[in-house]
Regions:
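Short glycine-rich or small-residue beta-strand-to-loop segments that form or flank ligand, phosphate
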Residues: 6-11, 72-79, 104
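Short, ordered loop/turn segments at secondary-structure junctions
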Residues: 12, 39-42, 60-61, 78, ...
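N-terminal beta-loop-helix "entrance" segment that forms/cooperates
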Residues: 33-57, 113-118
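Glycine-rich phosphate-binding loop
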Residues: 54-92
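A charged, well-structured terminal subsegment
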Residues: 67-74, 79, 128-145
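Short, glycine-/small-residue-rich phosphate/pyrophosphate-handling segment
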Residues: 105-142
Length: 145
């Protein structure tokens, strides 16, 4: 029997990125448990409607998921205090940044951070690349992570 991994998807604002990620991950990796965490109830609700296995809202769920998830996926801002127009608290950013979980961060430009050398990709292209990274993670033996 295949090991079930927990993927925490963290998003804020209206949750459109998180919604797209949940849909894509559940379609490609149905065996994966997806925990969707919204920094607000609107984002959490959008991710629930897209098929997440569970949802939560706010700072403490981010902190708990950072301790327990195998993978964390979301916009780059989730490791930057005050990003997403102030929705990412310093506690959230530190919890995600220090988490032992493998992190797949999409360089969405809403956090006053520029990534030099970053390509201008569409959201769909970034999600496709994120899915490839998730596949690589799932295929790698635990000791190689």
């Amino acid at each position: 029997m295949e090991t079930t991994h927990t993927v925490a998807i963290i998003d804020g604002q209206g949750g459109s990125l998180g919604k797209s990620l949940v849909e894509a991950i559940k379609a490609r990796f149905p065996q994966v448990k997806v925990l969707a965490i919204g920094t607000n109830s609107l984002a959490a609700s959008a991710m629930l409607r897209s098929g997440a296995d569970a949802i939560a809202t706010g700072e403490n769920p981010v902190v708990v998921a950072a301790r327990t998830a195998d993978l964390i996926v979301g916009p780059l801002g989730i490791i930057t205090a005050d990003a997403l127009h102030g929705e990412i608290t310093p506690t959230m950013a530190v919890a995600v940044a220090q988490s032992r979980a493998h992190k797949i961060l999409l360089p969405i430009s809403k956090c006053n951070v520029s990534i030099v050398g970053r390509q201008d990709l569409s959201l769909g292209e970034m999600i496709s690349l994120a899915l490839e990274d998730i596949q690589s993670f799932l295929d790698s033996p635990p000791h190689a992570r």
